[in-house]
């Protein structure tokens, strides 16, 4: 799904029976996610609180660049405000594509990065001609 709309997350087109993985949601996971993967569950340095896991969600400590799941294990993969922190974003995306059939990636806007820069952000990510560009 490609959207430039800041509220695009409200219409992810996740089907009722889809199995959903969310990578790195921290303190704000989507209720619809079935599995939560977080690389640093005990380090709240870059989030606004402790990792939140709803009762119906399974939690796994995992790096988005090396996910412990089989190919196509999920119908949908969500990565919200995480990719800009990745050591190797290309590997991270390869893993998302490997384990999921469809997905959603949201990153901070260029304006947001200029107005509120964060040291923990390794990348500024733009969508140019339907391609993600990292710098």
Predicted regions and their residues:
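Conserved N-terminal segment of class I S-adenosyl-L-methionine
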Residues: 1-71, 76
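Proteins with a high burden of low-complexity, intrinsically disordered sequence enriched in S/T/G/P/A and R
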Residues: 31-32, 38-48, 84, 90, ...
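S-adenosyl-L-methionine-dependent methyltransferase catalytic module, highlighting the catalytic core
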Residues: 61, 87-135
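A broadly tuned preference for mixed-charge, low-complexity surface segments
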Residues: 68-80, 127-135
């Amino acid at each position: 799904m490609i959207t430039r709309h800041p509220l695009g997350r409200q219409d992810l087109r996740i089907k009722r029976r889809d199995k959903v993985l969310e990578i790195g949601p921290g303190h704000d996971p989507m209720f619809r996610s079935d599995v939560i993967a977080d690389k640093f569950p005990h380090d709240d340095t870059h989030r606004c609180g402790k990792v939140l896991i709803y009762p119906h969600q399974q939690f796994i400590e995992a790096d988005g660049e090396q996910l412990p799941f089989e190919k196509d294990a999920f119908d949908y993969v969500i990565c919200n405000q995480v990719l800009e922190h990745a050591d190797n974003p290309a590997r991270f995306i390869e893993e998302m594509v490997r384990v999921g059939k469809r997905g959603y990636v949201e990153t901070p806007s260029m304006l947001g990065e200029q107005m509120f820069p964060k040291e923990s952000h390794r990348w500024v990510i733009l969508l140019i001609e339907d391609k993600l560009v990292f710098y």
